[in-house]
């Protein structure tokens, strides 16, 4: 073993430039390999944290020239209730953005600007929210919300966040209430999933109910049998004609394992 090290040192001294180039090449090669491997693994496992991933689909609109994922609320609701093969659905407003919240009172008042997503309660039946404390059913209550664990710890420290109040100092888009009570804390989602780590709270039951112009919502559905997705779309497209834009139709594309 000593002779191997000795020969290695001698080679380095005699061929310094070649040895340096070889070592640098190996470092670069291994760095690139690790980067590609990490990226490949992230793509391969995208949304795989959700146990029902193979049966989850996002509703898209397609024309002869384009395709887009956002929907108007009445339309998404009509589709979600159109087939017995659709076991569950959720409608999400992902564009609320960050909202400034305060906690505490008077001289110990603290403020936090955090992302908010409004949605219908079915989201917790479709996607896997790993509960840390509280209840996922809290989204049935318009006063309550779900927080990611990292946010709960940042705001409330190591004490329980359940029952604590967050007061929005500005309007929450698509939400009537400004005061939210923490009803559940979920484990943070990894980066390779479609869901963001945000405050989830229920969408106002009256928001955009009759609005056929506001294309801001995402609609996800859970199917009992993924092989029926084309039939579901075909039946709905026939029963719900798009006029005057007759070439527009709905589709449920495979969204990388979801």
Predicted regions and their residues:
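Short, strongly hydrophobic transmembrane alpha-helices
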Residues: 11-43
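Structured, solvent-exposed hinge/loop segments at the ends of secondary-structure elements
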Residues: 33-159, 169-178, 234, 241
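Short, hydrophobic secondary-structure boundary micro-motifs
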Residues: 20-21, 89, 258
């Amino acid at each position: 073993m000593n002779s191997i090290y000795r020969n290695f040192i001698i080679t380095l001294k005699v061929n310094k430039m070649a040895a340096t180039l070889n070592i640098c090449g190996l470092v670069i090669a291994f760095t690139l390999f690790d980067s590609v491997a990490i990226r490949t693994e992230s793509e391969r496992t995208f949304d795989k944290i959700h146990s029902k991933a193979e049966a989850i689909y996002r509703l898209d609109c397609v024309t002869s020239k384009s395709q887009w994922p956002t929907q108007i609320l009445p339309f998404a609701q009509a589709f979600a209730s159109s087939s017995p093969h659709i076991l569950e659905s959720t409608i999400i407003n992902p564009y609320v953005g960050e909202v400034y919240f305060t906690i505490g009172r008077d001289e110990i008042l603290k403020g936090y600007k955090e992302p908010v997503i409004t949605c219908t309660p079915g989201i917790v039946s479709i996607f896997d929210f790993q509960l840390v404390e509280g209840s996922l059913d809290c989204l049935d209550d318009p006063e309550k919300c779900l927080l990611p664990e990292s946010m709960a710890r940042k705001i409330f420290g190591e004490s329980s966040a359940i029952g604590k109040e967050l007061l929005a100092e500005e309007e929450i888009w698509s939400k009537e209430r400004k005061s939210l009570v923490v009803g559940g804390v979920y484990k943070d989602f990894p980066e390779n999933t479609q869901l963001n780590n945000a405050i989830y709270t229920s969408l106002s039951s009256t928001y955009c109910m009759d609005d056929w112009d506001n294309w801001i919502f995402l609609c996800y559905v859970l199917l009992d049998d993924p092989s029926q997705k084309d039939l579901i779309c075909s039946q709905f497209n026939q029963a719900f004609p798009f006029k005057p834009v007759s070439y527009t139709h709905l589709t449920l594309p495979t969204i990388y394992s979801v």
